[in-house]
Amino acid sequence: MRPAGRSNNQVRPVTLTRNYTKHAEGSVLVEFGDTKVLCTASIEEGVPRFLKGQGQGWITAEYGMLPRSTHTRNAREAAKGKQGGRTMEIQRLIARALRAAVDLKALGEFTITLDCDVLQADGGTRTASITGACMALADALQKLVENGKLKTNPMKGMVAAVSVGIVNGEAVCDLEYVEDSAAETDMNVVMTEDGRIIEVQGTAEGEPFTHEELLTLLALARGGIESIVATQKAALAN
């Protein structure tokens, strides 16, 4: 039996609290069970040098974990003087995922930075970050419209992510830490609200997985993401 008695295709309870901080144009506290991430969206006029004069915007992201978001304290990367490879990989993933949610030409020459700070980690921090950051991005873009900076909202649709894997020979959705650490296969899937795939990161930690198992995991991910997107849309409607 899974932790908390979840079925294999069931995601943890997902909570999205909008306007969690007062300064950022968009801010969301996202909770996937005991994993909690604060996601903020900040808008700046102008774009990176490589995009100047092209009439399009840019979306980038930064990711970090608070020192005691994990079971034992991890030193801040700022104190070490550099970011780790895992951090850089995750923040690039978040940025790629969210650029897929926006018409960058319609955004115009604005840069939006998504900051994802893990307050508490219990598996799936990158997938929670993508899900929460998409909400923060949606709120920030709406503010550009409300402030008269944009005529139309360039958001193409919601994006969400979930982890799937094979644990004790069974395919499961939205892994907690105890499952993730024991998984034979671990995969992160990012999709649009209509089920198109943005990114798949999959690794056989133990035995290699079959083509059939891959399809099973992708189907599990799609079902989980449909549930998460429904939660996103309900939160946006409030």
UniProtKB/Swiss-Prot annotation:
Xref: InterPro entries: ExoRNase_PH_dom1, ExoRNase_PH_dom2, ExoRNase_PH_dom2_sf, PNPase/RNase_PH_dom_sf, Ribosomal_Su5_D2-typ_SF, RNase_PH, RNase_PH_bac-type, RNase_PH_CS
Reactions catalysed, as given in the entry: tRNA(n+1) + phosphate = tRNA(n) + a ribonucleoside 5'-diphosphate
GO molecular function: 3'-5'-RNA exonuclease activity; tRNA binding; tRNA nucleotidyltransferase activity
Listed GO biological process terms: rRNA catabolic process; rRNA processing; tRNA processing
Chain sites annotated for binding phosphate: 86, 124-126
Gene3D superfamilies: GHMP Kinase, N-terminal domain
EC number: 2.7.7.56
Nucleotidyltransferase found in the keyword field: yes
Residue pairs linked by disulfide bridges in the UniProt entry: none
Keywords, in A-Z order: Nucleotidyltransferase, RNA-binding, rRNA processing, Transferase, tRNA processing, tRNA-binding
Alphabetical list of Pfam families matching this protein: RNase_PH, RNase_PH_C
Signal peptide: none
Assembly and oligomerization: Homohexameric ring arranged as a trimer of dimers.
HAMAP family: RNase_PH (MF_00564)
Family of this protein: Belongs to the RNase PH family.
NCBIfam families: RNasePH
Alphabetical list of PANTHER family matching this protein: EXOSOME COMPLEX COMPONENT (PTHR11953), EXOSOME COMPLEX COMPONENT RRP41 (PTHR11953:SF0)
Protein purpose: Phosphorolytic 3'-5' exoribonuclease that plays an important role in tRNA 3'-end maturation. Removes nucleotide residues following the 3'-CCA terminus of tRNAs; can also add nucleotides to the ends of RNA molecules by using nucleoside diphosphates as substrates, but this may not be physiologically important. Probably plays a role in initiation of 16S rRNA degradation (leading to ribosome degradation) during starvation.
Protein name: Ribonuclease PH
Gene label: rph
